[in-house]
């Protein structure tokens, strides 16, 4: 799922995704975080 977190690198999304999905899985796509 795309979340409303801006990013440059995928590792910026891991903590944000952990809060949302409970998993450290995500990547930066079009400067926005996508969680798995």
From Swiss-Prot:
Primary localisation category? secreted
Expressed, tissue-wise, as follows: Expressed by the venom gland.
Q: List the residue(s) that the UniProt entry marks as the site Aromatic residue of the functional dyad.
A: 36
Output one GO MF annotation: ion channel inhibitor activity
The answer to whether UniProt assigns keyword Iron-sulfur to this entry is: no
* Family annotation (Pfam families): Toxin_2 (PF00451)
**What InterPro entries is this protein classified in?**
Scorpion_toxin-like_sf, Scorpion_toxinS_K_inh
- Chaperone as UniProt keyword: no
Q: What Gene3D superfamilies does the entry give?
A: Knottin, scorpion toxin-like
The GO cellular component terms are:
extracellular region
- Disulfide bond entries: 7-28, 13-33, 17-35
The annotated site for Basic residue of the functional dyad falls at: 27
What subcellular locations does the record give? Answer: Secreted
Keywords of the record, alphabetical order, are: Calcium-activated potassium channel impairing toxin, Disulfide bond, Ion channel impairing toxin, Neurotoxin, Potassium channel impairing toxin, Secreted, Toxin
The record's function comment reads: Blocks calcium-activated potassium channels.
The family line of this record is: Belongs to the short scorpion toxin superfamily. Potassium channel inhibitor family. Alpha-KTx 16 subfamily.
Relay the domain remarks: Has the structural arrangement of an alpha-helix connected to antiparallel beta-sheets by disulfide bonds (CS-alpha/beta).
* Name this protein carries in UniProt: Potassium channel toxin alpha-KTx 16.1
């Amino acid at each position: 799922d795309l979340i409303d977190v801006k990013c440059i690198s995928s590792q910026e999304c891991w903590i944000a995704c952990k809060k949302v999905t409970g998993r450290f899985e995500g990547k930066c796509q079009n400067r926005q975080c996508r969680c798995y």
